[in-house]
Amino acid sequence: MVPDKMNAQKLAYEYIRERMLDGTYKGGMKLVEERLAGEIGVSRTPIREAIKRLEQEGLIKNKHVYNPTAQDLIYIYEIRIALESFAAKRAANYMRTETIIELENTIKKSRNLLLEGQSKKIYNETQHFHDLIINECQNPLMIERLEEAQTIFYLFSLRFDIYNRPHLIDEHEEIYKAIKNKDEQLASDLMAKHLYKDMNFTLEIIARNGQY
């Protein structure tokens, strides 16, 4: 069955995006419309529209899978520090009890994964921790910008092992406690410091790999 126009667009977009995020389509890879159309089973028009949408999201540049640089990483962190520190402040005021419990659970799961030596799986819990806080800012435009920044950062993380930063889980716990105690300024300050440390740690990894 040939998908209709809207379904074909959605199928093409989700197919390409998923393969970018799972590392199948690596940074710098050229996306060829004709080949993708045959792979997905749609015409070239929805492929073209999917690529255009992914370009708008910053995931594709000049029909190549975006390959973030160290400078791009700094720009992304500047966005995250500004917006997520504000989101943490809002979370300290508005986060519901059930969400606070879920926030604590991400920390418990992260500690268990660390004990089990599954450091790469900690990324998912880290992402969930930040997503819970971001969603509490109650600002759809801010959420959209942060989701885009985090997606680009995820593309970057596929190239390096950035999961073993010292004290990352402890910092999450400090942020969680500030939010639980409704200390908005402390929550905001701790989030900013946490992301600065994240940025510096990641830049050190890039430098060690000779890609800075």
Residue ranges and their predicted role:
Residues V2-K5, S188-Y212:
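C-terminal effector-binding regulatory domain of bacterial HTH transcription factors
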Residues R80, T97-L158, L168-A178, L186-Y196:
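Conserved amphipathic alpha-helical segments that form helical-bundle/coiled-coil interaction surfaces
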Residues R19, G23, A149, F153-F156, ...:
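A short secondary-structure junction motif
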